[in-house]
């Protein structure tokens, strides 16, 4: 506590023995011990009161935050909250609408302004969309699955200077890629 070693205690004991005398030394040590005990109890009591005041301050802050949350949510009732949610989500899709394949009228169209702003070109007329969003649903709604149109494969000429590959070599390469 005071960083007093055994040698310092021995010196203090010898000085006390000479100054007080051997007859009164036990009474003096008892009195010093009682004072030390009182000082420790007072320090512990002060520390306990300080910790209690800190806990009360924390509880007051928690109560204040709880009251703010309660005041903010007091205007909301369960019915009011549900109506707000249903209004923001819109009407849910019906099961009959989900089972129907998308038709040309249901497919969303991209305006030329939106296509030029996004930097993408409009899809070709022959290209088929596999998944399309229904016009009545939002982006988070389910997608309708439509049959994919098969396009005729057109032969692509290799660039000049490319090595010649026989048809059998291409077929073997394709089979090897499918196997792995």
UniProtKB/Swiss-Prot annotation:
The chain crosses the membrane at residues 1-21. GO terms for biological process: protein transport by the Tat complex. Residues 105-129 have a biased composition (Low complexity). Its main location: membrane. Residues 77-180 are annotated as: Disordered. It holds the Pfam family TatA_B_E. It is a single-pass membrane protein. The Tat system comprises two distinct complexes: a TatABC complex, containing multiple copies of TatA, TatB and TatC subunits, and a separate TatA complex, containing only TatA subunits. Substrates initially bind to the TatABC complex, which probably triggers association of the separate TatA complex to form the active translocon. Belongs to the TatB family. NCBIfam families: tatB (TIGR01410). This is Sec-independent protein translocase protein TatB. It comes from Nitrobacter winogradskyi (strain ATCC 25391 / DSM 10237 / CIP 104748 / NCIMB 11846 / Nb-255).
């Amino acid at each position: 506590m005071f960083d007093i070693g055994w040698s310092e205690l021995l010196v203090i004991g010898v000085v006390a023995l000479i100054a007080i005398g051997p007859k009164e030394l036990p009474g003096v040590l008892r009195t010093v011990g009682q004072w030390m005990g009182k000082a420790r109890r007072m320090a512990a009591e002060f520390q306990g009161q300080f910790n209690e005041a800190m806990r009360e301050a924390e509880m007051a802050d928690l109560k204040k935050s709880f009251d703010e949350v309660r005041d903010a949510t007091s205007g909301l009732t369960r019915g009011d909250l549900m109506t707000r949610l249903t209004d923001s989500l819109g009407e849910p899709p019906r099961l009959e609408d989900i089972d129907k394949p998308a038709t040309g009228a249901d497919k969303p169209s991209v305006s030329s302004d939106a296509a030029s702003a996004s930097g993408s070109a409009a899809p070709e007329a022959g290209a088929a969309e596999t998944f399309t969003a229904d016009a009545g649903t939002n982006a988070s709604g389910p997608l309708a699955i439509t049959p994919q149109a098969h396009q005729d494969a057109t032969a692509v000429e290799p660039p000049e200077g490319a090595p010649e590959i026989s048809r059998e070599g291409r077929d073997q390469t394709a089979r090897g890629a499918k196997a792995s």
